[in-house]
Regions:
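Specific transmembrane alpha-helical segments of multi-pass solute transporters/efflux pumps
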Residues: 16-68, 104, 187-205
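Helix-helix packing/entry segments at the starts of transmembrane helices
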Residues: 6, 63-70, 135-158, 191-227
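Residue-level signature of transmembrane alpha-helical cores of multipass secondary-active transporters
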Residues: 36-40, 65, 95, 119-127, ...
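Hydrophobic transmembrane alpha-helices of multi-pass small-molecule transport proteins
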Residues: 15, 78, 87-109, 127-130, ...
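Transmembrane alpha-helical core positions of polytopic small-molecule transporters
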Residues: 39-48, 71-72, 106, 127-134, ...
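Transmembrane alpha-helical segments that form core, pore/gating elements
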Residues: 12-15, 75-77, 81, 95, ...
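Loop-to-transmembrane alpha-helix entry segments
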Residues: 29-31, 65-68, 84-104, 113-120, ...
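Specific alpha-helical transmembrane segments that line the substrate/conduction pathway
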Residues: 2-13, 43, 52-86, 126, ...
């Protein structure tokens, strides 16, 4: 949590600088700051916090990403219930295939002792938090400038992570070249580039379509964890990855034109 606290505090500082230099408009209503703060804490602090705490409790990075890959199903169901978004038949099939593919890989990895129940529980909490933040962003934060909006969200997430860091760690950090490199990557690529891209996608498409892209996170994470951490890929895992990618393709594929 200390790492996340530093990440969000520094990301907030960068976004503030950009917002001031380019004179981006700030929200005028106080309620907008509350909505942005709720999204920031849910999506950034609790979402990634659940992932980090799960990994800290001996769950493998690949398995952690695979569990988070179940988020599209939860998001699609929640969007249908609370935001009345409709799903085409092929999208329902795609979500089911994606779920099956992720479940296949997660089950295979857990059978190999790659995770613990507490680690899975924290990851599930993170998945629910990411879903909540995504829906809240779609419902409450549309029309707000992405730079100033992200500044408020990272400020709220940073404060929350600072408080939680004292509950789950000593609040101390050991700075090494690897840690500094990871921090720079998470700030520039994940907190800035990826966050702006996510918010743009949410503003352009349905929650189910955007969330289905999260199915690709487990595939990429498992492939990256193979050479970096020595986490093996079994036939079951590879099969699950293929099924997952087919499912995502069905969800995001544009609907065909109705023949005349």
């Amino acid at each position: 949590m200390t790492f996340l606290a530093w990440r969000y505090v520094l990301a907030c500082a960068l976004f503030t600088l950009v917002a001031l230099l380019w004179r981006h408009p700030w929200p005028r209503q106080a309620i907008s700051y509350l909505h942005l703060s709720i999204t920031g804490v849910s999506l950034h602090c609790l979402g990634l916090g659940g992932v980090f705490l799960g990994i800290d409790r001996q769950i493998e990075a690949g398995v952690s990403a695979l569990i988070m890959g179940l988020q599209p199903v939860l998001a699609a169901v929640a969007a249908a219930l609370f935001m009345h978004e409709r799903l085409a038949g092929r999208q329902i099939v795609g979500l089911a295939l994606g779920f099956a593919g992720v479940a296949l890989v997660v089950g295979d990895r857990l059978d190999d002792g790659a995770g613990t129940l507490s680690g899975v529980a924290w990851n599930l909490l993170g998945m629910v938090a990411v879903t909540t933040g995504t829906l809240y962003q779609k419902a409450r934060n549309q029309g707000i400038n992405p730079f100033t909006g992200a500044t408020v969200q990272f400020a709220a997430a940073g404060i929350a992570c600072v408080l939680l860091s004292f509950a789950f760690s000593e609040g101390e950090s050991t700075w090494t070249p690897h840690v500094l490199g990871a921090l720079a990557w998470t700030i520039l690529v994940l907190s800035i580039a990826a966050t702006l891209l996510l918010y743009w996608l949410i503003s352009q498409g349905a929650v189910a379509e955007v969330s289905s892209l999260f199915y690709l996170v487990p595939v990429a994470a498992a492939l990256i964890a193979w050479p970096l951490f020595g986490e093996h890929l079994s036939l079951h895992a590879l099969t699950g990855m293929v099924i997952t990618m087919v499912g995502v393709a069905l969800v995001i594929r544009p609907a065909g034109k109705t023949p005349r």
